[in-house]
Regions:
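Long, well-ordered mid-to-C-terminal structural blocks that present hydrophobic/aromatic surfaces
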Residues: 257-317, 321-330
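Short amphipathic alpha-helical coupling elements at transmembrane boundaries
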Residues: 55-66, 90-94, 303-314
């Protein structure tokens, strides 16, 4: 009896291994690598964090709380926002033949409400929702709503001109990353979009990006302050939505229009707020592997990447910032003051699209749709690397403009 039970237990393991090998893909390999690092982090935590990976394992879980504050309420409010914004945004975007879901992540990061809002606005067009929510939503939206406001709270006032110039250079290549990421999505997933459709949907994005670039060139201080106000406003709105959703769900008292945030789905038994919190948890269990992986990448390839920085003509701190960007741009901004002027420019330009590529954005994408992991990585890195090239070419002109302004 015990033997047959043991055999049955082993068959569960062997069958699951066989299924994994049979369905192997680039995405599944990336996920497996992260899960190996998750185990490394867990073991190191048990051993008292001797190698530093246990701390990164914990950071993955600790990220769930802040993510829930910015994500859960907006996931719950996505139907409300779509009801309010849809009638205004859809006609404008339809003029260009673009889907209104592109609006969501032009201004919002995927993990700050952009993804659920994009999916809601896209409706039955899942492919364009994924493209807007995860390709565009990991590049342009995070820059507007997160990177600029957060950077303003960390860097000195003297460095704000470098921030503006870097964002200017970085935004130029966002459409390139979106096109490449969209093509990769069509080639590697079930979500198919033609190049013509991708280009058509990027028209409003290109127009908005161009206006921002022009604004940053002619009135950088006003534009940067405007982004700061916008970021603060988004935080306020997100907090209000979260508070309303929680109040409704706990008390059962509903408000007009907002009642959809707490109504349980008949099939899943989950309310939109429940779904938002579940999504945060799913992202967190990926981050507990992603963060130790990034730590290993930084330790292993940091030296080589710093040599690349030297080839670009930037100092050691700026080279270290490039490596930090791959996980989280906050670490980069913390050493911003120690960088040389060109290093500051290149770091911000790279951060516009490439920041979080192996950190939060990888974890978020894997948490909501594993099939999109590779297209997102490809799109972000292409946009980030081309931004470095553009920033390097524009550096003499941009830096002289900053110097003359001072």
């Amino acid at each position: 009896m015990w033997g047959s039970g043991k055999g049955a237990t082993m068959s569960v393991f062997t069958n699951s291994i066989s299924d994994w090998v049979h369905n192997i893909s680039i995405n599944s390999v990336i996920m497996m690598i992260m899960m190996i690092f998750m185990l490394v982090g867990a073991i190191d935590k048990i051993r008292g964090n001797k190698k530093g990976y246990g701390e990164k394992f914990e950071e993955g879980f600790n990220a769930i709380g802040p993510l829930a504050i910015s994500m859960a309420g907006v996931v719950a409010a996505a139907p409300v926002l779509a009801t309010i914004l849809g009638p205004v945004i859809k006609p404008i975007y339809n003029l260009f033949g673009a889907d209104s879901s592109m609006f969501a992540t032009t201004l919002l990061a995927c993990d700050m409400g952009g993804y659920p809002l994009a999916m809601e606005l896209a409706g039955d067009n899942v492919a364009i929702g994924k493209f807007a929510g995860l390709i565009l939503g990991t590049m342009m939206g995070p820059t507007i709503v997160f990177t600029i406001p957060v950077a303003l709270g960390i860097i000195s006032k003297d460095d704000r001109s470098y921030l503006g110039a870097g964002v200017l250079a970085g935004l130029i290549t966002v459409p390139i990353g979106c096109i490449v990421g969209g093509v990769a999505m069509s080639a590697m997933t079930e979500y198919k979009l033609g190049v013509g459709t991708i280009l058509q949907n990027l028209i409003p994005v290109i127009i908005i990006a161009a206006l921002i670039v022009i604004g940053l060139w002619f009135a950088p201080a006003k534009m940067i302050n405007g982004f700061n106000v916008f970021g603060t406003g988004v935080t306020v709105v997100i907090t209000v939505f979260t508070a309303i959703a929680v109040f409704e769900q706990i008390t059962g008292i509903m408000f007009p229009l907002f009642d959809v945030m707490a109504i349980k789905d008949e099939v899943t038994g989950l309310s939109p707020l429940d779904s938002g919190l579940l999504t945060c948890g799913q992202i967190g269990i990926v981050l507990i592997g992603a963060f130790p992986m990034v730590e290993w990448i930084t330790r292993t390839f940091g030296g080589a990447l710093e040599k690349l920085g030297g080839a670009l003509g930037i100092n050691e701190q700026a080279s270290a910032g490039m490596v930090a960007n791959l996980a989280n741009n906050i670490a980069m901004f913390n050493i911003f003051g120690e960088m040389d002027p060109k290093g500051k420019l290149l770091n911000v330009a790279f951060a516009v699209s490439a920041a979080f590529v192996f950190g939060d954005h990888l974890g978020f994408t894997a948490g909501v749709d594993q099939a999109m992991v590779t297209p997102v990585i490809i799109g972000k890195l292409v946009a980030g690397i081309t931004a470095l090239i553009v920033a390097n070419l524009l550096a003499p002109k941009l830096l002289s403009k900053i110097k003359s302004a001072k």
